[in-house]
Swiss-Prot record:
Annotated domain remarks: The Q motif is unique to and characteristic of the DEAD box family of RNA helicases and controls ATP binding and hydrolysis.
GO terms under biological process: nuclear-transcribed mRNA catabolic process, nonsense-mediated decay; rRNA processing
Official protein name in the record: DEAD-box ATP-dependent RNA helicase 30
Gene responsible for this protein: RH30
Biased segments, Gly residues type: 72-103, 549-571
Family matches, as SMART domains: DEXDc, HELICc
Gene Ontology terms, MF aspect: ATP binding; ATP hydrolysis activity; mRNA binding; RNA helicase activity
UniProt EC number: 3.6.4.13
UniProt keyword terms in alphabetical order: ATP-binding, Helicase, Hydrolase, Nonsense-mediated mRNA decay, Nucleotide-binding, Nucleus, Ribosome biogenesis, RNA-binding, rRNA processing
Amino acid sequence: MSSYDRRFADPNSYRQRSGAPVGSSQPMDPSAAPYNPRYTGGGGGYGPSPVMAGDNSGYNRYPSFQPPSGGFSVGRGGGRGGYGQYGDRNGGGNWGGGGGRGGSSKRELDSVSLPKQNFGNLVHFEKNFYVESPTVQAMTEQDVAMYRTERDISVEGRDVPKPMKMFQDANFPDNILEAIAKLGFTEPTPIQAQGWPMALKGRDLIGIAETGSGKTLAYLLPALVHVSAQPRLGQDDGPIVLILAPTRELAVQIQEESRKFGLRSGVRSTCIYGGAPKGPQIRDLRRGVEIVIATPGRLIDMLECQHTNLKRVTYLVLDEADRMLDMGFEPQIRKIVSQIRPDRQTLLWSATWPREVETLARQFLRDPYKAIIGSTDLKANQSINQVIEIVPTPEKYNRLLTLLKQLMDGSKILIFVETKRGCDQVTRQLRMDGWPALAIHGDKTQSERDRVLAEFKSGRSPIMTATDVAARGLDVKDIKCVVNYDFPNTLEDYIHRIGRTGRAGAKGMAFTFFTHDNAKFARELVKILQEAGQVVPPTLSALVRSSGSGYGGSGGGRNFRPRGGGRGGGFGDKRSRSTSNFVPHGGKRTW
């Protein structure tokens, strides 16, 4: 799209490019024919195009999505959850599965056969919306190189656009810019500055950035622009944007952001995940939503039962692709992508760049841009002060109490415990000792997990204990400190755990209780500390010397979790209900 092409200047010129299969339509007065979310006539099978609601400012002049008169209900998640550690029905050997009501096992999912789609005679759709603002145009090559160097941005691809220094450079609609301003952001994060122009140009994109880097808005705001330029949903149409996420926690958080910005843009969204009743999710899909955020297993359930389809999807996001492969979701991802038109725009996001993710990207993406923030190797955030303490297992709890007395001032503290049983035990004892602690793990019902997260986010219960279910994708602001009560099974999980603090440029602190049983991780842990500019305690160095070759053996390299492997577990094994969050506080309030 050339810089002089003003294709968004008026509704009529937009309508003629809308890709209607039966010629162009005459301009329609929205008041003349009320919008029906279940059916829209005219304009071919997809219904008429959105009509601009006023003269939007900005160089791109994006057409505003026209919501139905009288409003609509926003997608919502369900209540009671199932069992298992993760938010999908991913059991049967790789990771403990979270079944929920009406779910299937992972083995059953692998046997599901979705209908083969016919992608002949595809209707054209618009996906290039980017015009450089004068500020970006004025940047010299030296300016661009300096900006990227200062923010540790590296790029690959053909005709890579310059980064955006200010939110106004993206020329998002005014309502989106107002929402950004209310959140108090002063400038785009590095992944947003480079990712927005790439996404708005309509090209496929690979984004490599650590959690907490602002990547959700890096793909979500261009998605809203994309939706606004497409014809309205017609009867039985599926979504225009599909966002796949590995866990229900991450999916719910993406939905919160989508709802926050989508309401201002008149774009509907819903969240589809396991461990919650299907009824409300099915109603949202049948009502019609432009954006679906989903975990792979529950989405395949919905596709198999024909509660929705992906024929209208032209903007696909794979969030935390490395995590989805870790959890064994590759077969489900492939089945889902096979239902989507091949000329879609695809955005793949990952914290690391292992060979499996690279292979997936090579098969699913065409001529992509690549934006890397920092390194493709998993590294600890340098803004986090890491403190490693050698603590014998029997002394862990007393050491935790000492830390809490030093740290607790009402700020949020996240404590990671390796097992669900251990998580409940620590939480129960903390509450009996008067500390405001709540636990979250896979044996908690979905409604209880939602309640615990809400209490923790609001600060009403500033101490939360968790298993690794919360280690990836959990977006809680202002976590002062992370405590690794138990060292995790992989160094990858260690980095993701401590990454819950020190987000968005803030400083953070992480305490880790390290035992002699964890000695195999000592050598690589020292490397992580050194790479992040942290002090290596003499006791840890001594443990490395005493443990011989250390973790990784003679093969060399950092040994992270093998793809598709991991902890065993069943699916939907209905254990006795976890009651640690209901233990009364004992004694006096301790802070």
